[in-house]
Curated annotation (Swiss-Prot):
One of its GO terms (biological process) is L-tryptophan biosynthetic process. It holds the Pfam family PRAI. Keywords: Amino-acid biosynthesis, Aromatic amino acid biosynthesis, Isomerase, Tryptophan biosynthesis. Belongs to the TrpF family. CDD domains: PRAI. This is N-(5'-phosphoribosyl)anthranilate isomerase. SUPFAM superfamilies: Ribulose-phoshate binding barrel (SSF51366). Its EC number is 5.3.1.24. It is an enzyme of class 5 (isomerase). It catalyses: N-(5-phospho-beta-D-ribosyl)anthranilate = 1-(2-carboxyphenylamino)-1-deoxy-D-ribulose 5-phosphate. GO terms for molecular function: phosphoribosylanthranilate isomerase activity. Pathway: Amino-acid biosynthesis; L-tryptophan biosynthesis; L-tryptophan from chorismate: step 3/5.
Length: 199
């Protein structure tokens, strides 16, 4: 069953509207980004989503384990999505916290997989100027050689959501193509995506 994640939420009113939709995961960005949230914002947003039984994912880039663990505790995160490489030791510590770990692989011309990945799932995203939220896609045919479950991110919108589904991704991660302003998601665009996926 395909699941959806909307990433880069930072507005509480927006979050309350989104929480009513059939979306499984919501992403809060703790790394440097126009969509970055403070710990206080994260706590409030997380409470909104948990009230509707949604999963909350913290997005990190270079943050150390101590910072990540603090965010997990303070914002009651269900999982983390991280751009730097997670070590075996870090993965074991995170498992004790009862959170899932998504390792991001930034793709340009090849999948460029590390020999061993310590994560529950790999998230493939397009390599861009920013670490995520660039609104660009990579060549999804590259995923044909990957045999494990994965998450797909990068430039997914109404124009290519069916193509994204055909990659076999277990979770689609949507962000900038669903915005009117940085961090404000367009509810109507998301409803259109949900309608398309029912076809």
């Amino acid at each position: 069953m395909l699941k959806l994640k909307i990433c880069g939420i930072k507005d509480e009113k927006n979050a309350k509207d989104l929480a009513f939709l059939n979306i499984d995961f919501f992403g809060l960005i703790f790394a440097k980004s126009p969509r970055r949230v403070s710990l206080e914002q994260a706590r409030n947003l997380s409470a909104i989503f948990h009230e509707k039984d949604k999963k909350v994912v913290g997005v990190f880039v270079d943050e150390n384990l101590e910072q990540i663990l603090r965010c997990i505790k303070e914002a009651k995160l269900d999982g983390i999505q991280i751009y730097r490489t997670i070590t075996k030791e870090e993965f074991e510590i995170l498992k004790v916290q009862n959170v899932f770990v998504w390792q991001v692989i930034s793709v340009e011309n090849s999948l460029d997989l590390k020999s061993e990945i310590f994560a529950n799932l790999v998230l493939f995203d397009a390599k861009g100027i920013l670490k995520g939220g660039n609104g660009i896609s990579f060549d999804w045919t590259l995923l044909g050689s990957y045999t494990k479950d994965f998450i797909l991110a990068g430039g997914i919108g109404l124009d290519n959501v069916h193509k994204a589904v055909k990659t076999g991704a277990k979770i689609l991660d949507l962000n900038s193509k669903l915005e009117d302003e940085k961090g404000l998601k367009d509810i109507n665009k998301i409803k259109q995506i949900l309608k398309e996926l029912k076809k």
